Amino acid sequence: MSETPSTPTVPAGPEPGPISRWLNKQGFEHQLLDPDHLGVEVIGVESMFLQVIVAALKADGFDYLQCQGGYDEGPGQQLVCFYHLVAMAEMVAKMGVGDSSSEAAKVREVRLKVFLSREDTPSLPSIYGLFRGADWQERETFDMFGINFEGHPHPKRLLMPEDWKGWPLRKDYVQPDFYEMQDAY
């Protein structure tokens, strides 16, 4: 028996979804990421292109910011800021048609991710001007992870006291032994 040498197979990257293909046609650079467990298309974007890409997606029907948040990939790794956009008006219009097929009922949604270095002060442009609902969501992400949102109208802590040191949801955060709260009255 002779064995033929097998050529190593390189795992194929994710297939571009409809939103990625649309962004390519519009000339927007982005990174294809694996879809999430529900099949939602996930796209990586550079922070300098975030506002332009979000504005283009909003013009294409993604009229609802369902969620904005952040997470820490681990000590020494990157911070991630994500935006989940939904084409809500299209979904409402489809509901009125009465077509209950799974393809007609499918909601157009996309998740954008911006990967940031934890060195210095991570920052990216605020999308508050495009989605007013980003107000408290961006403030919470700032409060918990220390990501600054340039152009945000209220750039201050939301949950933690103003004089709190550090960013509590970063994985390298060291909780202080003692913090004295002032009386509220």
Swiss-Prot record:
Its main location: membrane. It is an enzyme of class 7 (translocase). It is found in: Cellular thylakoid membrane. Keywords: Membrane, NAD, NADP, Plastoquinone, Quinone, Thylakoid, Translocase, Transport. It is a peripheral membrane protein. GO terms for biological process: photosynthesis, light reaction. GO terms for molecular function: NADH dehydrogenase (ubiquinone) activity; quinone binding. It holds the Pfam family Complex1_30kDa. SUPFAM superfamilies: Nqo5-like (SSF143243). The keyword Membrane applies. InterPro entries: NADH_DH_suC, NADH_quin_OxRdtase_su_C/D-like, NADH_UbQ_OxRdtase_30kDa_su, NADH_UbQ_OxRdtase_CS. The keyword Membrane applies. Its EC number is 7.1.1.-. It catalyses: a plastoquinone + NADH + (n+1) H(+)(in) = a plastoquinol + NAD(+) + n H(+)(out); a plastoquinone + NADPH + (n+1) H(+)(in) = a plastoquinol + NADP(+) + n H(+)(out). GO terms for cellular component: plasma membrane-derived thylakoid membrane. NCBIfam families: PRK12494.1. NDH-1 can be composed of about 15 different subunits; different subcomplexes with different compositions have been identified which probably have different functions. Belongs to the complex I 30 kDa subunit family. NDH-1 shuttles electrons from an unknown electron donor, via FMN and iron-sulfur (Fe-S) centers, to quinones in the respiratory and/or the photosynthetic chain. The immediate electron acceptor for the enzyme in this species is believed to be plastoquinone. Couples the redox reaction to proton translocation, and thus conserves the redox energy in a proton gradient. Cyanobacterial NDH-1 also plays a role in inorganic carbon-concentration. This is NAD(P)H-quinone oxidoreductase subunit J. It comes from Prochlorococcus marinus (strain MIT 9303).
